[in-house]
């Protein structure tokens, strides 16, 4: 049985709750000693992992809608992507304000350049910012064919974000490896599209170099 538009609306409500409840838990944990010995790191890792979960959920929607034959599921993809961006912004903010501190924000640019894992993180965030800003139907109409080209950069984020996570923890542990494995699996489900994008990019580079 296929989902109806009304059911998808209720699903969106549930997804909004899924995006909001972790924030409420985090606020509670901060105020009631629910974090570990290094609360700053705990906040950074929690916000980063939540952003990564929403990123992977966003990529899951298309194959899930296709294989389950539920085309209306696609309507939830933008919502998940926006929650991913919101949590990624909280992740970046927690690093800037809690790790560096308000008085040391001038160091942020240097940190992002000199620490490779932070460089990967900020590249991912900038891409997510662009995708969030252009996620409306009005922007889709305005950009035309370039809209899809821009939003294909989400695949780069899916590669960079797990690497950023693995690099940031500095030790090999199961959790970041699981996220990396899920990212690889979701990319593998799109291998034909990714191969086509790679061949197109290679052709464009070759044509420019031949000029």
Swiss-Prot record:
One of its GO terms (molecular function) is FMN binding. The chain crosses the membrane at residues 10-30, 82-102, 116-136, 153-173, 178-198. Binds 1 FMN per subunit. It is a multi-pass membrane protein. The keyword Calcium does not apply. Its cofactor is FMN; heme b. One of its GO terms (cellular component) is plasma membrane. Keywords: Cell inner membrane, Cell membrane, Electron transport, Flavoprotein, FMN, Heme, Iron, Membrane, Metal-binding, Transmembrane, Transmembrane helix, Transport. It is found in: Cell inner membrane. It holds the Pfam family Ferric_reduct. One of its GO terms (biological process) is protein repair. The keyword Cell membrane applies. Heterodimer of a catalytic subunit (MsrP) and a heme-binding subunit (MsrQ). Part of the MsrPQ system that repairs oxidized periplasmic proteins containing methionine sulfoxide residues (Met-O), using respiratory chain electrons. Thus protects these proteins from oxidative-stress damage caused by reactive species of oxygen and chlorine generated by the host defense mechanisms. MsrPQ is essential for the maintenance of envelope integrity under bleach stress, rescuing a wide series of structurally unrelated periplasmic proteins from methionine oxidation, including the primary periplasmic chaperone SurA and the lipoprotein Pal. Belongs to the MsrQ family. This is Protein-methionine-sulfoxide reductase heme-binding subunit MsrQ. The gene is msrQ.
